[in-house]
């Protein structure tokens, strides 16, 4: 049995009782990475020497305090880490080896004495749904390496599923934590927009991006969010709202809980296996005293188009800073300064990033702004209003995280629109700004995980966690492990 089959709380007790050391945990993490990551490709950069040095320092401390004391974790490679290479999985930043500061979430993790083992693979600049847009080797799904892990936080989900680390951080702009969590059979939370500081997150779409945790269990997830959540003066979009004890919320049952199930989330396009898994999950909730009713989110059918217009427009502006002057790739074939800007960006960015920059620039251009960008903002408000109305009457919204289980590597790369449709059930949550979590709720006939998505009201992650935990404890799905490289 791997040490990483225990929860963070259980490992904390083992450390306290001196059954294990922090060095044991960190060594196990790297041993597992060296054993299986040549198949999974979850990590882009490792920090083994410094991590082991920190582990030994922590073992020497008499006061072993910290909510995540000694726990090995991984950081998505678009979250800045001081002195540790940060590439956003882009060749443009391949030589960005020494960032000058830590993101706020990294500072908070360090304050609780976690150990960062390395930086995780992703779709380039977080633009993608399969991790096939990585500027390096694409991450593979630990349950079947012929399948994708999801994206853009594919490395974050795959590393946890493969037992390489106890927890990871990802970012979620349109489903980039929840979708890979569903594909990899782990727990992934996108908090309320503003709940977690974005300072130090390389921006994709600033009005949609949110950092969140990926773990094997709901309890571990709640524990990590308690650490990283909270107001930050360095982020003007950070909400000054009190952070409750999410782990305390897990102790409450779901008797009397009112669940809304949008008919649009079980409509055509959602596979029968996924529908059946969701309906079975609803039966579990009924057995625990919760009730559910079918509802409608009528504007969700416009969410995909709205999202890609808005997110690409914001990306067009945010990625303008990557010009080859201060850091990153600089073309050696330029005739002048303007030519250098153009060629550096053309040579440094991958195809999907360039596609979205062009789409966003078009939507913001003179003559098209009102027809596209402004109209998309109005539709976003309608989508938000749909959620507000439902969440006034119900405690949570429940449905599938993805329309299907993980698809095969290369299956959808030739058709961007088909690829984009994978996020159709997660995107509305980002547009509304509400919290959402994905937890395992079954497996396909091919043995691939299926995810249950639970959506809550603004800053009410506690109810989302309570709902997720009740289901998790009533089922066994989260206890299954992929058979990878002689897996645990």
Swiss-Prot record:
Under the GO molecular function aspect, what terms does this record hold? ATP binding; glutaminyl-tRNA synthase (glutamine-hydrolyzing) activity
Name the Gene3D superfamilies on file: Amidase signature (AS) domain (3.90.1300.10)
What protein family is recorded?
Answer: Belongs to the amidase family. GatA subfamily.
Please indicate which superkingdom the organism of origin belongs to. Answer: Bacteria
Quaternary structure annotation from Swiss-Prot or TrEMBL: Heterotrimer of A, B and C subunits.
Reactions this protein catalyses: L-glutamyl-tRNA(Gln) + L-glutamine + ATP + H2O = L-glutaminyl-tRNA(Gln) + L-glutamate + ADP + phosphate + H(+)
Cellular component terms (Gene Ontology): glutamyl-tRNA(Gln) amidotransferase complex
Against InterPro entries, the record matches this protein to:
Amidase (IPR000120), Amidase_CS (IPR020556), Amidase_dom (IPR023631), AS_sf (IPR036928), GatA (IPR004412)
Q: What is its EC number?
A: 6.3.5.7
Q: Which Pfam families match?
A: Amidase
Please give the name of this protein: Glutamyl-tRNA(Gln) amidotransferase subunit A
Matching SUPFAM superfamilies, A to Z? Amidase signature (AS) enzymes (SSF75304)
Function (record text): Allows the formation of correctly charged Gln-tRNA(Gln) through the transamidation of misacylated Glu-tRNA(Gln) in organisms which lack glutaminyl-tRNA synthetase. The reaction takes place in the presence of glutamine and ATP through an activated gamma-phospho-Glu-tRNA(Gln).
GO biological process terms, semicolon-separated: translation
- Active-site residues from the entry: 76, 152, 176
The family database entries (NCBIfam families) matched by this protein are listed as: gatA
Identify the enzyme class: ligase
Q: Which UniProt keywords apply?
A: ATP-binding, Ligase, Nucleotide-binding, Protein biosynthesis
